[in-house]
Swiss-Prot record:
Its main location: membrane. This is Oryzalexin D synthase. The gene is CYP76M8. It is found in: Membrane. Heme binds at residue 442. GO terms for molecular function: 3alpha-hydroxy-ent-sandaracopimardiene 7-beta-monooxygenase activity; ent-cassa-12,15-diene 11-hydroxylase activity; heme binding; iron ion binding; monooxygenase activity; oxidoreductase activity, acting on paired donors, with incorporation or reduction of molecular oxygen, NAD(P)H as one donor, and incorporation of one atom of oxygen. It comes from Oryza sativa subsp. japonica. Belongs to the cytochrome P450 family.
């Protein structure tokens, strides 16, 4: 047994060394050079340079030394990191199609999820085009979003009611936002209240989804050394497989109950699930597609919107003059109106600017989702991006590029009010790309740009907000921590004070 294990170890080391020296030869081969970067060490590459600290900060610091287009070896995996507006514009305008595939973390290969998920399927795959079209024309259309608006308004009302019940008390802002938005997403998609519903199924679904969100952020040796992927040495794929199976079982039960509801000719719910099941009945998608779409809504939608709101509230508490200005706009526009409606947010340009500025400074997806170079021929900044490499857009660094922004590290919402033409969330102006850009723009954007400003307006219109325990704005810690997303290093606690 010991001899066989020793041979396995030597075999793995031999393969690793082969890949390492092959990479060095390629770096100095003919044609366009690879982007500059720190010299990789045998086996580990540059992993020693990015361990500890905040990952996107580390990448920015390395880019200051090696340039805005940089090669980074993480184990045996070649990464090209793009950290400036100019380089990002070149990549998206010239090579969006070439870079529109995804680098797939091994965890998401569990249950074959990545092979059927719109998040990870290459954009050249007909299946991706079909799923993207379904989202654009059947899930996030103005008609469908308008039909579900009463649900969103009711669930935001529930969130405000929760905060009213805890007025004058210290609350964890991120937890309150996540709970409220998870309820809203679950009810909008399939009319199930995940948090308050007393069923074991609802509680278990939330717990399992939370577990999956945590595990996907763990460093995985299978991603750094792809030849070890079949061994799943850390067991993360096996662990995730069990959770995926449980999630899909629970969601499958929800689908079956809805199908029975339809067969019995009971009234429609007019939620997203009704729309999706109509497509399944027409043969445009299958059950696995439906399960994946529902799962993606939970993992990506609820968590991202909740973290965004936590960040904007942190910056408002850090900058009380900005909060006062945003609340003054609410009074001017809404007057004595007690309850904010979703449509009101469009009439609040300064509040929209506050939100955009918080997302510029603290994008939840600081590195977006990794892209993957499917073919040779991509050149950015005069350097070759090799086929098979992972391409990381450091959106956090790009949106703090001094070539694009004055005082890039300061919280100045006025920059979005004064700018002409106005910057939107769609990433056409690459210096502001919190939802990505190009073909892989976040498909949930139409929902997020309605929900997040609506919740923010409701929170500021109903409550004054204070820091707990006599903490001053200067003492509030708004430093960042990178997990699966860019989060506050110290979760935000605040006190909602009901406006009389």
């Amino acid at each position: 047994m010991e001899n066989s294990q020793m041979w396995l170890l030597w075999g793995a080391l031999s393969v690793a060394l082969f890949f390492y020296f092959s990479t060095l030869r390629r770096r100095y081969a003919g044609g366009k050079p690879l982007p500059p970067g720190p010299t990789p060490l045998p086996l580990i590459g540059n992993l020693h340079l990015v361990g500890g600290g905040t990952f996107h900060h580390k990448l920015r610091d390395l880019a200051r030394v090696h340039g805005p287009v940089m090669t980074l070896k993480l184990g045996l995996a070649t990464n090209v990191v793009i950290s400036s507006r100019e380089a990002a514009i070149e990549a998206y305008t010239k090579y969006d199609r070439h870079l529109a595939a995804r680098a797939t973390p091994d965890t998401f290969r569990a249950c074959g999820f990545a092979d059927r998920s719109m998040v990870f399927i290459p954009s050249s795959d007909p299946q991706w085009k079909a799923l993207r079209g379904i989202h654009a024309s059947h899930v996030f259309t103005p008609r469908v979003l308008a039909a579900v608006r009463p649900i969103r308004e009711r669930k935001v009302g529930d969130l405000i009611a929760y905060l009213r019940a805890h007025a004058g008390e210290e609350v964890l802002v991120g937890h309150a936002m996540y709970t409220g938005i998870l309820n809203m997403v679950s009810f909008s998609y399939f009319s199930v209240d995940i948090v308050d519903m007393g069923s074991q199924m609802a509680r278990e679904l939330r717990e399992v989804v939370d577990d999956i969100i945590l595990v996907v952020g763990k460093p995985n040796v299978s991603d750094f050394y792809p030849f070890l992927r079949p061994l799943d040495l850390q067991g993360l794929r096996r662990w995730t497989t069990k959770r995926f199976n449980r999630v899909f079982s629970i969601m499958g039960d929800i689908i079956d109950r809805r199908l029975a509801h339809i067969r019995d000719n009971k009234p429609r719910h007019d939620d997203f699930l009704d729309s999706i099941l109509e497509l399944m009945a027409a043969g445009k998608i299958d059950r696995v597609n439906v399960l994946n779409m529902l799962f993606e809504a939970f993992v990506a939608g609820a968590d991202t919107m909740a973290l965004t709101l936590e960040w904007v509230m942190a910056e408002l508490l850090k900058n009380p003059s900005v909060m006062a200005k945003a609340r003054a706009e609410l009074r001017d526009v809404l007057g004595d109106k007690e309850i904010v409606e979703e449509a009101d947010a469009a009439r609040l340009p300064y509040l929209q600017a506050v939100l955009k500025e918080a997302m510029r400074l603290h994008p939840v997806g600081a590195l977006l989702l990794p892209h993957f170079a499917m073919e040779d021929g991509v050149e950015v900044g005069g350097y070759a991006v090799p086929k098979g490499s992972t391409v990381l857009f450091n959106a956090w660094a790009i949106m703090r590029d001094a070539a694009a922004w004055e005082r890039p590290d300061e919280f100045v919402p006025e920059r979005f009010v004064e700018r002409t033409p106005q910057l939107d969330f769609r990433g056409k102006d690459v210096e502001f790309m919190p939802f990505g850009s190009g073909r892989r723009l976040c498909p949930g954007l139409p929902l997020a740009e309605r929900v997040v400003p609506f919740i923010l307006a409701s929170m500021l219109h109903t409550f004054e907000w204070e820091l707990p325990g006599g903490m001053t704005a200067e003492e509030l810690d708004v430093s960042e921590k990178f997990k699966t997303a860019n989060v506050l290093a110290v979760p935000l606690k605040a006190v909602p004070v009901l406006i009389k």
